[in-house]
Amino acid sequence: ESYDTTTVRASVPMWLLCKYIKENTKCRYIFSGEGSDEILGGYLYFHHAPSTEEFAYENMRRLHLIHQFDGLRADRCAGAHGLDLIVPFLDKRFIESCMSIDQNLKRDAIEKKILREAFIGYLPHEILWRQKDGMSDAVGTNWVSEVKEYTGTVIDDSLFEEIQTKCKGHNVCLSKEEAYYREQFWLMYGTDQDHLITEIWRPKWTTITDPSARLLIEKTHN
């Protein structure tokens, strides 16, 4: 129900995981970690926020849009296999508590430092303090590169330009991968439902338009 790149990329491994749980276990309730990045400013691009005020605004904006991205992905993947999703980080009391924290405590440190510190003694050090990696990046080193390669073969230059024109200025595709997802969305829902996705998930404060966290890491280190 989305043509957003990072949503589609992450949906594939989560859908497969939910399918495996349904077919190979007796579990029907699954805990999932959606929400912590939105609530605590955990995405890597937040390190580039030029001020605390802009950090705080983007923090709130990401939370308000979660139903279009990670929330949508998690709900549909679990629901498609009859699983009940439990998202502790989206508990109303947890959200209210975290959003009342001084924003400066969320900045200038490793992503979600406050949350990591809360689990000291419960998780191994190497897991607790490793750098954040996006789901679509972390499931395998080749997943994102292979899907880019595939979509580049099925969307030629002329079709890419045609799809860009059909976007009519709304969430215009910047890559052939985005164009492929947009075309599939149109085939399923028609071209008059584009507005349901108000924006494409992209990092801020950087020239990178691809949502891959690894690309942001590489640019920062270079």
What is the predicted function of each stretch?
Residues 1, 44-51:
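Short secondary-structure boundary/capping segments
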Residues 21, 47, 102:
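Active-site catalytic pocket residues across diverse enzymes, especially alpha/beta-hydrolases
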Residues 1-16, 20-24, 29, 71-72:
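Cysteine-dependent PTP/DSP-like catalytic domain, specifically the C-terminal lobe
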Residues 26-32, 38, 51, 55-222:
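Adenosyl-5′-phosphate
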